């Protein structure tokens, strides 16, 4: 599986859209590392589109793995 990497401008736009808060637990960026996550994982048919990306803190993203969000 390829490692997801995105343009810095898209990453910034997603961080702004999600108010730099983890979409799962609500943690804010100043307290923990944030990552851009695919809501529907690429391995499950998700796409590399803005609407399929969200901000998750590192712990939530690790727990989510390749499962669907929610």
Tell me the role of every PLM-derived stretch.
Residues 1-24:
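Short, charged surface segments at domain edges that flank catalytic/cofactor-binding sites
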Residues 19, 62-65:
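Generic structural signal for secondary-structure transition and capping sites
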Residues 2, 60-63:
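Generic cytosolic/nucleocytoplasmic N-terminal low-complexity/intrinsically disordered segments
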Residues 26, 58-61:
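Cys/His-coordinated zinc-binding microdomains
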Residues 27-55, 66-70:
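Histidine-centered nuclease catalytic patch
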Residues 21, 40-41, 60:
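Short, flexible coil/turn micro-motifs enriched in small/turn-prone residues
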